[in-house]
């Protein structure tokens, strides 16, 4: 599948800071969770880690382009209900009638919007760790049958 990066939008979902305490003080490192999508059925996510935030975001974008999936969209919504679990996060996706909009919160919304889905109902249950929620959402979208 040939991917033209100019067609894709990216959203930084989460930036985390980790601290390593050393003799001379604290050493900070950052990680970034990024979702990319062309709003036409292709979406992916990536995680990048670096000593500076912009470097972590750049690495995350590069990683996201390696993990792109195709989403089967039926009109403006999805074909059927789906529930998926990743670690302690559970996600429910339900098709919605036209004009409903994207009813999604937290880390689920950017994935749904960048996939190009216009009408959907979602519910996130269990852990709301951004990485797990994004991963559960993308896995669920990948399992939708046309």
Swiss-Prot record:
Tagged with keyword DNA-binding: no
Record-level Gene Ontology MF annotations: rRNA binding; structural constituent of ribosome
Residues in the signal sequence: none
Classification via Gene3D superfamilies: 3.30.160.20, 3.30.230.10
Occurrences of domain S5 DRBM (ranges): 8-71
GO CC list: small ribosomal subunit
Record's keyword terms, sorted: Ribonucleoprotein, Ribosomal protein, RNA-binding, rRNA-binding
Disulfide bridge positions per record: none
InterPro entries the UniProt entry points to: Ribosomal_Su5_D2-typ_SF, Ribosomal_uS5, Ribosomal_uS5_bac-type, Ribosomal_uS5_C, Ribosomal_uS5_N, Ribosomal_uS5_N_CS, Ribsml_uS5_D2-typ_fold_subgr
Family statement drawn from the similarity comment of this UniProt entry: Belongs to the universal ribosomal protein uS5 family.
Name by which UniProt lists this protein: Small ribosomal subunit protein uS5
Organism: Helicobacter hepaticus (strain ATCC 51449 / 3B1)
């Amino acid at each position: 599948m040939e991917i033209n990066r100019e067609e894709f939008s990216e959203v930084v979902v989460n930036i985390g800071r980790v601290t390593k305490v050393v003799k001379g003080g604290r050493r900070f490192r950052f990680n970034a969770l990024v979702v990319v999508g062309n709003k036409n059925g292709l979406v992916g996510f990536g995680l990048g880690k670096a000593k500076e935030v912009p470097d972590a975001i750049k690495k995350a974008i590069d990683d996201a382009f390696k993990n792109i999936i195709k989403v089967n969209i039926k009109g403006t919504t999805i074909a059927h209900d789906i529930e998926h679990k990743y670690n302690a996060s559970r996600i429910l996706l339900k098709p919605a009638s036209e004009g409903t909009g994207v009813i999604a919160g937290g880390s689920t919304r950017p994935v749904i919007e960048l996939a190009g889905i216009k009408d959907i109902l979602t519910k996130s249950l269990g852990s709301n760790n951004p990485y797990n929620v994004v991963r559960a959402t993308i896995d669920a979208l990948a399992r939708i049958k046309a």
